Swiss-Prot record:
Lineage, opening ranks: Bacteria, Bacillati, Bacillota, Bacilli, Lactobacillales
NCBIfam families the record matches: PRK05327.1 (NF003717), rpsD_bact (TIGR01017)
Protein's UniProt keywords contain Acetylation: no
Primary gene name: rpsD
Protein name: Small ribosomal subunit protein uS4
Function: One of the primary rRNA binding proteins, it binds directly to 16S rRNA where it nucleates assembly of the body of the 30S subunit.
Single Gene Ontology BP annotation: ribosomal small subunit biogenesis
PANTHER family: 30S 40S RIBOSOMAL PROTEIN, SMALL RIBOSOMAL SUBUNIT PROTEIN US4M
Amino acid sequence: MSRYTGPSWKKSRRLGLSLTGTGKELARRNYVPGQHGPNNRSKLSEYGLQLAEKQKLRFSYGLGEKQFRNLFVQATKIKGGILGYNFMLLLERRLDNVVYRLGLATTRRQARQFVNHGHILVDGKRVDIPSYRVEVGQVISVREKSAKVPAILEAVESVVGRPAFVSFDADKLEGSLTRLPERDEINPEINEALVVEFYNKML
């Protein structure tokens, strides 16, 4: 299954989760799109609940099914800790997500584009792989030639607040993951236990 690139507002309403991170999609119409609108919420089976939660998490990070599943498999091989939390940490440590958390992009989709286009450096070296796994303390910065890109500057200026687990220098356009986030600091609306149950049945 390929990565979803369609209208994020419609998908957000279907999933009941803001994929842009702004919440604007749900502010006016917090029900699924379509003719029947708010009356179209049906009771889901156990499998349906697990699938829906998996889709919410997958779409929120903008990953294709194969990439998402492979990351889950990697999480199962981590010794110690809770599987669901370990999986969430792998998602959070993706370079495109860290760029988004630092406020260098307004959405994860935009952050992925910035990485793909070579605008982002890791410890001074250009990295154009969105799935690159960021280590605590690594410096994420904007390439000098990209420092005047309007979309990047607009993103930085529009930031209201950043997570406590990152640091950022707006003058240098650089920041880092200062520590691994606690579970309650990332996607509190997601029940990752349902995602674990889904894949435990599938793998």
